[in-house]
Curated annotation (Swiss-Prot):
This is DNA ligase 1. Pfam families: DNA_ligase_A_C, DNA_ligase_A_M, DNA_ligase_A_N. InterPro entries: ATP-dep_DNA_ligase (IPR050191), DNA_ligase_ATP-dep (IPR000977), DNA_ligase_ATP-dep_C (IPR012309), DNA_ligase_ATP-dep_cent (IPR012310), DNA_ligase_ATP-dep_CS (IPR016059), DNA_ligase_ATP-dep_N (IPR012308), DNA_ligase_N_sf (IPR036599), NA-bd_OB-fold (IPR012340). It comes from Arabidopsis thaliana. The active site is at K444 (n6-amp-lysine intermediate). The record marks R193, N466, K646, K671 as: Interaction with target DNA. ATP binds at E442, R449, R465, K601, R614, K620. Mg(2+) 1 binds at E497. The lineage of its organism: Eukaryota, Viridiplantae, Streptophyta, Embryophyta, Tracheophyta. The keyword Cell cycle applies. Its EC number is 6.5.1.1. A motif (Nuclear localization signal 1) lies at residues 68-75. A motif (Nuclear localization signal 2) lies at residues 505-512. Expressed in all vegetative and reproductive tissues.
Length: 790
């Protein structure tokens, strides 16, 4: 048997007809190829040797005639007259395109042998399959159009929303990634938190109603995560690798993609634009949420030789299959920069609300005033003690939101967010806030917060305040605790501070010394900077969680479980007193031994451990900040101004920003040019020069009157001290929280140090800035800056 090569048909199409005829012509040719494949070889030979036209010649002739009737023979004005398709010439007399000789494929090139084992289909079955294929494509097309036309329904108030009217896929079918991408696109045009939460809630409800098994993947992608933070799973792809994937997927050069990225400042927009200008003959299967999520996890697992190439190819396969706005949001997800004005907390709130509408298990507790608000609160609270979507989401679906606290508990081996303290400016303020309440004061150590889990199998896991796994960084800590825990202790979770310590001089060393230690795979024999563990809380002991117990009980459990060894493991130095003079002396003593100040905690009233919360039941008092704003702040340099005079050649001042967690944006708060030694200024200028970008990020909020000379990628975190905070018409920090139209700025900011232990998104939040402003003793309307601050 012989069959027509479809690829050879298609190669001849461009030389036979204009671009508008291609779709008509190609479908005819595919049908012709199947019909001719059933002709016997002998019949073909007779037809070719006969003086009459062959079957192929007749079919081609008919196709040309049909194409001429459907499309007028006019000059193609849609492309440049200087550009010609391959195999075309320009007739000078007629001024129209004609097919040059030799461009048609030879008959033998159009025929290829078919395996004898293949059973030829009848013409009827061939035509029937063509119809099915066409119907499937039409159905896919209509499903996409239907989804785009319906996506606006997600903006309805949840009470008025019907998931069945929104879904464009059958129950049990995988959720299309386009659905999530279109929902993201809808959110991108909104700024109100309530509207954004409603859209997310309705999106999640639609997934629950159709394909609940896809909910975990949908929640992870919405939160722009691929795994729990403590697992340390990251995509591990740089911008250059993503650029390569985009260029190869969409037929662009890397230089072209880089140029567009510089112009647009958003690789997602570059990917979307590249896809929109690319035509494809054969469309891959549409992406699903699960396909994207599973591929992300596969990318994260790639390691070793050629891992970057493998990651790039996986990304490319996803990009090739994208359509509409999918390239934009797929690329941003790959960059872990979704930037849609909502955070993981918003996703949790939406998840809780979606569960209420899907609730089939139980009714809300009696006297629940607002089930939606209560459900959102429950999911957020559960996430603080068990931050694992893979556990929470199935529990939510099977047991309901009201039972979630019973089914999802604090678990050994899964770190919780640390309880944090609010700043205060003096001992008198402490006594005023803690009237008639027993409280204790502890030294505030200048080290690295650590949450240490000791498993029942005898292994340790050490986590940072951000749930990063630091076990390999502190092997000496694990050895010390193994030696000093009492035999009765089989498992525990310890909250403590790991501090650099000189054992010969019996002296606490500054944080800067601690930061010189290697961060991964540390060998005990190579350690040059020793550390001491200062323990102040016990959250779990021998299978029993203690976070609901008051501090007095937790601390007793701590003291009973370990032996102290000075320089290796010590309990935080503490005193319980409400005498103002005694507390002042204790504060001075803490500073003398190298501590930052004091942490003041309620002892037996309102004294439970509140995970991931900056609580009024813990206060911090820093000696250096009693005459300023009460605390230092951690800010991100997002731009700079060229230096003049003796600072020529370096940056003379930097524009700093705080971070708004809910809006996912950096908001300008001050310019800083003081606190730098010449060496530090050179170092910071050199470091940030490699982070210069052409235009500010879309998620930077800066006043119109500020015109920096250069903009930076948000990469560094600087600890800054200031005299006070003021309302500012120039800066955008906390706009809308204290003043509806104006932001907050720092007066007389001074750089203290670079915080290498923090990511930009972990900088001081706009909400914290507002809290500091409101806590100022002299807070009055005249405390306002009319112009720019230096």
């Amino acid at each position: 048997m012989l069959a027509i090569r479809s690829s050879n048909y298609l190669r001849c199409i461009p030389s036979l007809c204009t671009k508008t005829q291609i779709s008509q012509f190609s479908s005819v040719l595919i049908s012709f190829s199947r019909q001719i494949s059933h002709l016997r070889l002998s019949s073909c030979h007779r037809a070719m040797s006969s003086s009459r036209p062959s079957a192929f010649d007749a079919l081609m002739s008919n196709a040309r005639a049909a194409a001429k009737k459907k499309t007028p023979q006019t000059t193609n004005l849609s492309r440049s007259p200087n550009k010609r398709k391959i195999g075309e010439t320009q007739d000078a007399n007629l001024g129209k395109t004609i097919v040059s000789e030799g461009t048609l494929p030879k008959t033998e090139d159009l025929l290829e042998p078919v395996s004898d084992s293949a059973n030829p289909r009848s013409d009827t079955s061939s035509i029937a399959e063509d119809s099915k294929t066409g119907a499937k494509k039409a159905k896919t097309l209509s499903k996409t159009d239907e989804m785009k036309s319906k996506i606006g329904l997600l903006k309805k108030k949840p009470n008025d929303f019907d998931p069945e009217k929104m879904s464009c896929w059958e129950k049990g079918e995988r959720v299309p990634f386009l659905f999530v991408a279109l929902a993201f696109d809808l959110i991108s045009n909104e700024s109100g938190r309530i509207v954004i939460t409603d859209i997310l809630c309705n999106m999640l409800r639609t997934v629950i109603a159709t394909t609940p098994e896809d909910l975990v993947a949908t929640v992870y992608l919405s939160a722009n995560e691929i795994a729990p933070a403590h697992e340390g799973v990251e995509l591990g792809i740089g911008e250059s690798t993503i650029i390569k994937a985009i260029s190869e997927a969409f037929g662009r050069t890397e230089d072209h993609v880089k140029k567009q990225n510089t112009e647009l400042g958003d690789l997602g927009l570059v990917a979307k634009g590249s896809r929109s200008t690319q035509t494809m003959m054969f469309k891959p299967e549409p992406l699903t949420v699960v396909k994207v999520f599973d591929t992300f996890r596969q990318i994260a697992k790639e390691s070793g030789k050629d891992s970057n190439e493998k990651k790039k190819n996986r990304m490319k396969a996803l990009l090739v299959a994208t359509t509409d706005c999918e390239p934009l949001y797929l690329t941003r997800l790959l960059q872990a920069k979704l930037r849609l004005g909502f955070s993981g907390q918003t996703v949790l709130a939406a998840l809780g609300q979606a569960a209420v509408y899907n609730e089939e298990h139980s009714k809300p507790p009696p006297n629940t005033k607002s089930p939606l608000e209560e459900a959102a609160k429950i999911v957020k609270q559960v996430f603080t003690v068990l931050p694992v979507y893979d556990i929470i989401v199935p529990a939510l679906l099977s047991g309901g939101v009201w039972n979630l606290p019973k089914t999802c508990n604090f678990t050994l081996g899964v770190p919780i967010g640390p309880m944090l303290a609010k700043p205060t400016k003096g001992v008198a303020e402490i006594l005023n806030k803690f009237q008639d309440i027993v409280f204790t004061c502890e030294y505030k150590y200048d080290g690295e917060r650590a949450q240490i889990h000791f498993m029942e199998d005898g292994t340790f896991e050490i986590y940072s305040r951000n749930a990063e796994r630091n076990t390999g960084k502190y092997p000496d800590v694990a050895l010390a605790l193994s030696r000093l825990k009492k035999p009765s202790v089989k498992s525990f979770i310890l909250d403590c501070e790991v501090v650099a310590f000189d054992r010969e001089k019996k002296k606490i060393l500054p944080f800067q010394i601690l930061s010189t230690r290697a961060r991964k795979n540390v060998n005990v024999n190579d350690i040059k900077v020793g550390v001491c563990i200062f323990a102040f809380d016990m959250l779990y002991l021998n299978g029993q969680q203690l976070i609901q117990e008051n501090l007095k009980i937790r601390r007793e459990k701590l003291y009973e479980s370990f032996e102290e060894d000075p320089g290796y493991f010590q309990f935080a130095t503490a005193v319980t007193s409400n005498d103002i003079d005694e507390i002042q002396k204790f504060l001075d003593a803490s500073v003398d031994v190298g501590c930052e100040g004091l942490i003041i905690k309620t002892l037996d009233s309102d004294a439970t451990y509140e995970p991931a919360k900056r609580s009024n039941n813990w206060l911090k008092l820093k000696k250096d900040y009693m005459d300023s704003i009460g605390d230092s702040v951690d800010l991100v340099p997002i731009a700079a101004f060229h230096g003049r005079g003796k600072r020529t050649g370096v940056y003379g001042a930097f524009l700093l920003a705080c971070y708004d967690v809910d809006k996912e944006e950096f908001q300008s708060i001050c310019k800083i040019g003081t606190g730098f030694s010449d060496a530090m200024l050179d170092e910071r200028s050199s470091s940030l020069r490699s982070q210069v970008i052409a235009t500010p990020k879309q998620y930077y909020r800066v006043g119109d009157s500020l015109n920096p000379d250069v903009w930076f990628e948000p990469t560094e975190v600087w600890e800054v001290k200031a005299a006070d905070l003021t309302i500012s018409p120039v800066h955008r920090a906390a706009t809308g929280i204290v003043d509806p139209d104006k932001g907050i700025s720092l007066r007389f900011p001074r750089l203290l140090r670079v915080r290498e232990d923090k990511k930009p998104e972990e900088a001081t939040s706009s909400e914290q800035i507002a809290d500091l402003y409101q806590a100022q003793k002299h807070n009055h309307p005249s405390n306002e800056v009319k112009g720019d601050d230096d």
